[in-house]
């Protein structure tokens, strides 16, 4: 198991085999075989009281980004700027609580998972396999879930 990780922003394919590719505030358009990371934040990189008026990223947006990143073999580093006293503001706390509730319910779809190596590969894409699932969504989040 790795005890340290080295990151690099501008790496060719060969370098990505030894150094973890860091895609700042972005993501590749397809699954990448080597692990990679993207970093983003709820608002600004540093604490800024304007975000209380301007707003932060929503929990739904962060969750969608997390699922997209993980499905492409990536890691999401989420920066949550702290006030000078080391605490979160109320809006940040509410967003983190909502993300936490989603992960408590759906964490098994994120933690310890591995992407399919070929898009569309797997039991659902194979002929003759019946799918038994119920799906639902809420208009406010646009996040789909399926019954086990």
Regions found by a protein language model. Give the residues of each.
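Mature catalytic domains of secreted/periplasmic carbohydrate-active enzymes
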Residues: 1-148
